[in-house]
Protein backbone atom coordinates (compact mmCIF):
# COMPACT_ATOMS: atom_id res chain seq x y z
CA UNK A 1 0.00 0.00 0.00
CA UNK A 2 1.37 3.41 -0.95
CA UNK A 3 2.11 5.87 1.80
CA UNK A 4 -0.41 8.71 2.27
CA UNK A 5 0.36 11.87 0.35
CA UNK A 6 0.82 15.15 2.22
CA UNK A 7 -2.03 17.62 1.76
CA UNK A 8 -1.82 19.94 -1.24
CA UNK A 9 -2.22 23.68 -0.82
CA UNK A 10 -3.75 26.02 -3.41
CA UNK A 11 -3.30 29.25 -1.46
CA UNK A 12 -6.72 29.17 0.16
CA UNK A 13 -7.40 25.51 0.83
CA UNK A 14 -5.65 22.25 1.56
CA UNK A 15 -6.85 19.12 -0.21
CA UNK A 16 -7.91 17.84 3.23
CA UNK A 17 -10.34 20.74 3.73
CA UNK A 18 -12.15 19.02 6.60
CA UNK A 19 -8.95 19.39 8.63
CA UNK A 20 -8.72 23.08 7.75
CA UNK A 21 -12.10 24.30 8.93
CA UNK A 22 -12.86 27.99 9.43
CA UNK A 23 -13.58 28.92 13.02
CA UNK A 24 -14.22 32.46 14.22
CA UNK A 25 -13.57 32.51 17.96
CA UNK A 26 -14.02 35.09 20.71
CA UNK A 27 -11.12 37.51 21.01
CA UNK A 28 -8.18 36.10 22.95
CA UNK A 29 -6.05 38.60 24.91
CA UNK A 30 -3.06 36.29 24.38
CA UNK A 31 -2.97 36.86 20.62
CA UNK A 32 -0.64 39.90 20.83
CA UNK A 33 1.78 37.83 22.92
CA UNK A 34 1.68 35.03 20.35
CA UNK A 35 2.54 37.60 17.69
CA UNK A 36 5.40 39.07 19.72
CA UNK A 37 6.98 35.65 20.27
CA UNK A 38 6.75 34.71 16.59
CA UNK A 39 7.96 38.12 15.45
CA UNK A 40 11.07 37.73 17.58
CA UNK A 41 11.74 34.28 16.09
CA UNK A 42 11.32 35.67 12.57
CA UNK A 43 13.54 38.66 13.26
CA UNK A 44 16.26 36.38 14.60
CA UNK A 45 15.99 33.94 11.68
CA UNK A 46 16.06 36.63 8.99
CA UNK A 47 18.70 38.85 10.63
CA UNK A 48 17.72 41.64 8.24
CA UNK A 49 18.52 45.22 9.33
CA UNK A 50 15.63 47.59 8.77
CA UNK A 51 13.01 44.84 8.63
CA UNK A 52 9.54 45.90 9.76
CA UNK A 53 7.28 43.27 11.33
CA UNK A 54 3.63 44.14 11.92
CA UNK A 55 0.72 42.29 13.51
CA UNK A 56 -2.22 42.61 11.09
CA UNK A 57 -5.57 40.95 10.57
CA UNK A 58 -8.32 40.48 13.12
CA UNK A 59 -6.11 39.05 15.88
CA UNK A 60 -4.32 42.42 15.90
CA UNK A 61 -7.52 44.24 16.93
CA UNK A 62 -8.25 43.99 20.68
CA UNK A 63 -11.70 42.59 21.38
CA UNK A 64 -12.37 41.48 17.79
CA UNK A 65 -13.53 37.91 17.22
CA UNK A 66 -11.25 36.16 14.75
CA UNK A 67 -9.93 32.97 13.30
CA UNK A 68 -7.17 31.93 15.74
CA UNK A 69 -4.42 32.56 13.19
CA UNK A 70 -1.75 35.22 13.73
CA UNK A 71 -1.28 37.28 10.57
CA UNK A 72 2.17 38.80 10.24
CA UNK A 73 3.17 41.43 7.69
CA UNK A 74 6.85 41.70 6.79
CA UNK A 75 8.19 45.03 5.51
CA UNK A 76 11.66 44.36 4.07
CA UNK A 77 13.66 47.48 3.24
CA UNK A 78 13.76 48.66 -0.39
CA UNK A 79 16.23 46.78 -2.55
CA UNK A 80 16.05 43.56 -0.56
CA UNK A 81 15.33 40.47 -2.67
CA UNK A 82 12.19 38.97 -1.09
CA UNK A 83 13.12 35.49 -2.32
CA UNK A 84 15.85 35.53 0.32
CA UNK A 85 13.12 35.36 2.96
CA UNK A 86 11.91 31.94 1.84
CA UNK A 87 14.56 29.58 3.23
CA UNK A 88 14.73 31.14 6.73
CA UNK A 89 10.93 31.12 7.04
CA UNK A 90 10.76 27.52 5.87
CA UNK A 91 13.32 26.79 8.56
CA UNK A 92 10.78 28.07 11.09
CA UNK A 93 8.15 25.65 9.80
CA UNK A 94 6.38 27.86 7.27
CA UNK A 95 5.11 26.53 3.95
CA UNK A 96 5.57 28.92 1.04
CA UNK A 97 2.87 29.10 -1.63
CA UNK A 98 5.14 28.94 -4.67
CA UNK A 99 2.26 28.64 -7.15
CA UNK A 100 0.69 31.96 -6.13
CA UNK A 101 -0.61 33.54 -9.39
CA UNK A 102 -0.14 37.00 -7.85
CA UNK A 103 3.60 37.39 -8.31
CA UNK A 104 3.57 40.70 -6.42
CA UNK A 105 2.77 38.95 -3.16
CA UNK A 106 4.28 36.16 -1.07
CA UNK A 107 2.24 34.05 1.33
CA UNK A 108 3.45 31.59 3.98
CA UNK A 109 1.43 29.32 6.28
CA UNK A 110 2.53 27.65 9.51
CA UNK A 111 0.94 24.78 11.38
CA UNK A 112 -0.67 22.58 8.73
CA UNK A 113 0.09 18.85 8.42
CA UNK A 114 2.54 17.27 8.32
CA UNK A 115 4.08 20.04 10.46
CA UNK A 116 1.17 20.58 12.84
CA UNK A 117 -2.54 20.09 13.39
CA UNK A 118 -3.90 23.34 11.97
CA UNK A 119 -2.99 26.84 10.84
CA UNK A 120 -1.39 28.97 13.52
CA UNK A 121 0.35 31.77 11.59
CA UNK A 122 0.30 33.46 8.19
CA UNK A 123 3.16 35.60 6.89
CA UNK A 124 2.53 38.15 4.14
CA UNK A 125 5.06 40.01 1.99
CA UNK A 126 3.80 42.55 -0.54
CA UNK A 127 4.57 45.95 -2.07
CA UNK A 128 4.35 48.68 0.53
CA UNK A 129 1.44 50.36 -1.24
CA UNK A 130 -0.56 47.20 -0.55
CA UNK A 131 0.79 46.84 2.97
CA UNK A 132 -0.45 50.34 3.68
CA UNK A 133 -4.05 49.16 3.19
CA UNK A 134 -3.63 46.36 5.72
CA UNK A 135 -2.26 48.74 8.33
CA UNK A 136 -4.93 51.36 7.70
CA UNK A 137 -7.70 48.75 7.99
CA UNK A 138 -6.24 47.39 11.23
CA UNK A 139 -5.83 50.80 12.83
CA UNK A 140 -9.31 51.90 11.78
CA UNK A 141 -10.91 48.84 13.39
CA UNK A 142 -8.89 49.42 16.57
CA UNK A 143 -10.46 52.85 16.91
CA UNK A 144 -13.97 52.31 15.50
CA UNK A 145 -15.87 49.66 17.48
CA UNK A 146 -19.03 49.89 15.36
CA UNK A 147 -17.10 48.89 12.25
CA UNK A 148 -15.23 46.20 14.20
CA UNK A 149 -18.57 44.79 15.35
CA UNK A 150 -19.94 44.83 11.79
CA UNK A 151 -16.85 43.02 10.57
CA UNK A 152 -17.10 40.39 13.33
CA UNK A 153 -20.79 39.73 12.59
CA UNK A 154 -19.98 39.31 8.90
CA UNK A 155 -17.21 36.83 9.64
CA UNK A 156 -19.36 34.73 11.97
CA UNK A 157 -22.10 34.48 9.34
CA UNK A 158 -19.65 33.52 6.60
CA UNK A 159 -17.88 30.94 8.78
CA UNK A 160 -21.22 29.24 9.40
CA UNK A 161 -22.02 29.27 5.70
CA UNK A 162 -18.59 28.27 4.34
CA UNK A 163 -16.86 26.23 7.07
CA UNK A 164 -14.39 24.56 4.68
CA UNK A 165 -14.25 27.02 1.77
CA UNK A 166 -11.77 29.78 2.54
CA UNK A 167 -12.03 31.29 -0.91
CA UNK A 168 -15.80 31.78 -0.55
CA UNK A 169 -15.33 33.02 3.01
CA UNK A 170 -12.80 35.63 1.90
CA UNK A 171 -14.86 36.65 -1.13
CA UNK A 172 -17.92 37.04 1.08
CA UNK A 173 -16.16 39.78 3.07
CA UNK A 174 -15.51 41.93 -0.02
CA UNK A 175 -18.39 44.36 0.33
CA UNK A 176 -17.98 44.97 4.06
CA UNK A 177 -14.21 45.34 3.76
CA UNK A 178 -14.68 47.83 0.93
CA UNK A 179 -17.18 49.91 2.87
CA UNK A 180 -15.03 50.04 6.00
CA UNK A 181 -11.84 50.74 4.08
CA UNK A 182 -13.57 53.40 2.03
CA UNK A 183 -14.59 55.18 5.23
CA UNK A 184 -11.07 54.90 6.60
CA UNK A 185 -9.51 56.29 3.44
CA UNK A 186 -11.91 59.21 3.30
CA UNK A 187 -11.75 60.07 7.00
CA UNK A 188 -7.96 60.01 7.13
CA UNK A 189 -7.59 61.97 3.87
CA UNK A 190 -5.36 59.18 2.68
CA UNK A 191 -3.05 59.95 -0.29
CA UNK A 192 -5.08 57.56 -2.47
CA UNK A 193 -8.16 59.75 -1.91
CA UNK A 194 -6.23 62.98 -2.47
CA UNK A 195 -4.75 61.67 -5.71
CA UNK A 196 -8.16 60.70 -7.04
CA UNK A 197 -7.16 57.04 -7.34
CA UNK A 198 -9.97 56.14 -4.94
CA UNK A 199 -13.08 58.30 -4.97
CA UNK A 200 -14.61 57.05 -1.73
CA UNK A 201 -17.08 54.34 -0.82
CA UNK A 202 -20.23 56.02 -2.21
CA UNK A 203 -18.81 56.47 -5.70
CA UNK A 204 -17.21 53.09 -6.17
CA UNK A 205 -18.67 49.61 -6.42
CA UNK A 206 -17.53 47.45 -3.50
CA UNK A 207 -15.59 44.90 -5.52
CA UNK A 208 -13.93 47.57 -7.65
CA UNK A 209 -12.85 49.42 -4.52
CA UNK A 210 -11.51 46.32 -2.81
CA UNK A 211 -9.62 45.21 -5.93
CA UNK A 212 -8.04 48.65 -6.19
CA UNK A 213 -7.01 48.60 -2.55
CA UNK A 214 -5.77 45.03 -2.46
CA UNK A 215 -3.95 45.25 -5.78
CA UNK A 216 -2.03 48.35 -4.76
CA UNK A 217 1.03 49.34 -6.73
CA UNK A 218 2.01 47.14 -9.65
CA UNK A 219 5.45 46.25 -8.40
CA UNK A 220 7.29 43.43 -6.73
CA UNK A 221 7.97 43.53 -2.98
CA UNK A 222 11.13 45.48 -2.38
CA UNK A 223 11.15 46.81 -5.94
CA UNK A 224 11.85 50.40 -7.03
CA UNK A 225 8.19 51.46 -6.78
CA UNK A 226 8.28 50.61 -3.07
CA UNK A 227 11.00 53.11 -2.23
CA UNK A 228 8.78 56.20 -2.14
CA UNK A 229 6.37 54.44 0.19
CA UNK A 230 8.94 53.04 2.57
CA UNK A 231 9.84 55.98 4.78
CA UNK A 232 6.34 57.46 4.88
CA UNK A 233 4.80 54.11 5.71
CA UNK A 234 7.34 53.24 8.38
CA UNK A 235 6.78 56.66 9.98
CA UNK A 236 3.05 55.92 10.24
CA UNK A 237 3.25 52.25 11.18
CA UNK A 238 1.27 51.30 14.28
CA UNK A 239 -0.08 54.80 14.82
CA UNK A 240 -3.83 54.67 15.53
CA UNK A 241 -6.09 56.36 13.01
CA UNK A 242 -8.53 58.80 14.60
Curated annotation (Swiss-Prot):
Chain intervals for the UniProt region annotation (Disordered): 215-242
SUPFAM superfamilies named in the record: Nucleotidyltransferase (SSF81301)
Entry superkingdom: Bacteria
InterPro entries per the UniProt record, alphabetical: GrpB/CoaE, NT_sf
A Pfam family: GrpB
Signal peptide bounds: none
Protein family according to the UniProt entry: Belongs to the UPF0157 (GrpB) family.
Official protein name in the record: UPF0157 protein PA4798
Organism annotation: Pseudomonas aeruginosa (strain ATCC 15692 / DSM 22644 / CIP 104116 / JCM 14847 / LMG 12228 / 1C / PRS 101 / PAO1)
Source organism phylogeny: Bacteria, Pseudomonadati, Pseudomonadota, Gammaproteobacteria, Pseudomonadales
